[in-house]
Regions:
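Acidic/polar-rich alpha-helix caps and helix-coil junctions
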Residues: 1-103, 115, 132-268
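NTP-handling and nucleic-acid-processing catalytic cores
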Residues: 112
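C-terminal/domain-terminus segments
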Residues: 104-109
Length: 268
C-alpha cells in the first residue's frame, strides 16, 4: 500500500503498486491451481483472492492494451508503454541483450546477421486460431496453400513464416524461405537456416543495427495478463459472471478473433 502508482524520470521501471498487485495475483492463481489440480482440493478462496487482486490492478485505470501487438516487443517501446506493468529494464550501450541475433536466421534484417538459436515448433504455430475462432483443423477458412491467412493477427507478428515477406539487408522485402536443408546442422548458418523452418519476430527488431546489443525491455507483467488472470480466477469461483467474457474478449478483439460466448462455462 506504500508503493506509488507511477514513477517518473530515472525511477521509471521500479516496482509500482500495480506490479506488486500483479505479483500477488499471480501467486494466488498458482496456489489455487496447484491446490485444485494437484491436490484435488477446494480452492475457492484462493481463486477469489486472485481475481480480487487482478481487479484492483484494472481499477487503477493506469493500464490498457496497445493497439499494435508487435509494438510491445520493439526497442521503441522502451518508454514503458500503457500495457507494461513491470519489465526488466535495458539501456542502450549500457545494459543489453542478444535476442534479435538469437531469434533470426542469417540473411534477414538490416544487418543480415542471425544465429537461428530460438526456433518455434510447428505445433506452436498451428495452435493459433482462425479468424472465426476455430482451430485450423475445424475451420473451413483454413487453406493449406495459404496457411497464414485468416489467422489470429498475432501469428504474423510473432513468427517469421515461410513465404511471408521479410526485411533484407538491401532494404527490400522478399519472402522468407527456409533453406531446403534447414534441418541439417552443417547448414544452420546458411540463408534461412533454422531447425524448424520458423523463426521469431517477437523481441526481434529487424530494423535494429545492434542485433547483439538490443535494449528492448523484457516484459514481466502486461495488462493483457491482468485481464486473463482476472478471467481465469473469476471463472473458477463464479462461473458465468459477465466480467469473465468482458476481460477475455478485450484480448481476443486485439487479436482479430471473435468474442467468446456469454454463456461459456468454466469447463470450456
Amino acid at each position: 500500500e506504500y508503493l506509488p502508482e507511477t514513477y517518473s524520470g530515472d525511477d521509471v521501471g521500479r516496482i509500482t503498486k500495480g506490479a506488486a498487485l500483479m505479483l500477488k495475483a499471480d501467486m494466488y492463481l498458482d496456489m489455487a491451481s496447484y491446490k485444485k489440480f494437484h491436490q484435488g482440493e477446494e480452492a475457492k478462496e484462493l481463486w477469489k483472492e486472485a481475481a480480487s487482486l487482478a481487479k484492483k490492478v484494472i481499477d487503477l485505470n493506469l493500464y490498457g492494451l496497445e493497439n499494435d501487438f508487435a509494438f510491445l516487443f520493439k526497442a521503441a517501446a522502451n518508454n514503458n508503454n500503457k500495457e507494461v506493468i513491470l519489465a526488466h529494464q535495458y539501456m542502450e550501450d549500457e545494459l543489453t541483450h542478444m535476442l534479435p541475433v538469437l531469434c533470426s536466421p542469417s540473411g534477414v534484417g538490416v544487418t543480415g546477421r542471425g544465429w537461428a538459436s530460438f526456433c518455434p515448433t510447428r505445433d506452436l504455430v498451428d495452435s493459433y486460431e482462425m479468424t472465426d475462432g476455430k482451430t485450423i483443423y475445424e475451420s473451413s477458412l483454413y487453406d493449406m496453400d495459404h496457411p497464414w491467412e485468416n489467422r489470429d493477427a498475432r501469428l504474423k507478428k510473432t513468427f517469421m513464416l515461410p513465404g511471408v515477406d521479410i526485411l533484407r539487408p538491401d532494404g527490400s522485402y522478399t519472402p522468407y524461405m527456409p533453406h531446403p536443408a534447414y534441418n541439417n546442422p552443417e547448414r544452420i548458418n546458411n540463408e534461412g537456416g533454422g531447425i524448424t523452418g520458423y523463426m521469431y519476430l517477437k523481441y526481434n527488431d529487424l530494423e535494429l543495427e545492434k542485433v547483439d546489443a538490443s535494449w528492448t525491455n523484457f516484459s514481466l507483467y502486461r495488462y493483457a495478463e491482468t485481464l486473463l488472470i482476472y478471467a481465469e480466477a473469476l471463472n473458477e469461483y463464479e462461473p458465468y459472471n459477465a466480467e469473465i467474457v468482458w476481460a477475455v474478449n478485450q484480448v481476443r478483439k486485439r487479436a482479430g478473433l471473435p468474442g467468446v460466448d456469454s454463456q461459456l462455462g468454466n469447463q470450456e
